[in-house]
Amino acid sequence: MEEDHPTTYRFDPKTVALIGKYQSREISESLSLLARELERRGLTVIVEKSTAESASSPEFERWARCDFAGIGQRADVAIVLGGDGTMLNAARQLAHYCVPLVGVNQGRLGFMTDIARS
């Protein structure tokens, strides 16, 4: 009965985009772990093009790469690993597409990226 309630919202993403702070070794490792876990759960993973290019791992070759326009057209949700600046950039780039963002804080203090990496 709860499913019929007008405020109930079911979100069942199939494609997840990963966006990370460029040139960050720690984020490359976290993105790789996250991508593998998402795949294990049956989700399609795409990685933002510049994030993949700056990653130090050849493992990133296995996932599709997209620019922000491609993410906007293909992703059901985007997970942003970085700080508030990375989150603001992703939000600005994807605002036109209305892709929901989830921020994972990789820095010391995050106001918008409030989920801790651990």
Roles of regions detected by a PLM:
Residues 53, 58, 63-118:
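Small-residue-rich beta-alpha loop regions that form the catalytic core of phosphotransfer
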